[in-house]
């Protein structure tokens, strides 16, 4: 049980690298090396606890390429996925510096509310 918690904590701190890795596996179809039928089957095998989280990590990698990785690590994956929502909506107009500052300053729930207010 402690090992599982330690593994989850490591995933939470290495989410930037993990998102990049998952995107590479999907785009290169490296899941076929294990004789799997699909990328989803790969995720079921490697991320049995949460395929959704795996897709979140991939979205962070794909949607926030201009944000320095240490800054993403600093705010954490749950706030980074909220940043993804704003980045998708605003596209090239996304002001990452302003939103990163908000992510650093606000508690998780307050930041989520700020994003929801912005998007509605």
For each predicted feature, which ranges?
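Short helix->loop/beta-hairpin flanking segments within DNA-binding domains
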Residues: 20-35
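Amphipathic alpha-helical "recognition" segments
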Residues: 17-24, 40-117
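Alpha-helix N-cap/helix-initiation sites
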Residues: 11, 15, 32-36, 51
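Short N-terminal micro-motifs specific to bacterial/archaeal maturation
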Residues: 9, 33-34, 45, 102
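Residue-level detector of alpha-helix boundaries and kinks
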Residues: 6-7, 27-28, 68
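Short, charged, low-complexity amphipathic alpha-helix
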Residues: 1-17
């Amino acid at each position: 049980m402690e090992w599982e918690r330690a593994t989850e904590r490591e995933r939470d701190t290495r989410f930037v690298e993990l998102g990049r890795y998952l995107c590479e596996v999907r785009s290169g179809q490296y899941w076929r090396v294990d004789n799997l039928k699909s990328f989803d089957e790969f995720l079921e095998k490697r991320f049995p606890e949460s395929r959704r989280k795996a897709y979140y990590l991939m979205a962070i990698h794909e949607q926030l390429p201009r944000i320095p990785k240490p800054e993403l690590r600093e705010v954490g994956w749950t706030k980074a996925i909220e940043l993804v929502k704003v980045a998708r909506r605003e596209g090239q107009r996304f002001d990452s510096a302003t939103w990163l500052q908000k992510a650093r300053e606000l508690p998780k729930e307050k930041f989520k509310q700020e994003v929801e207010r912005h998007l509605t």
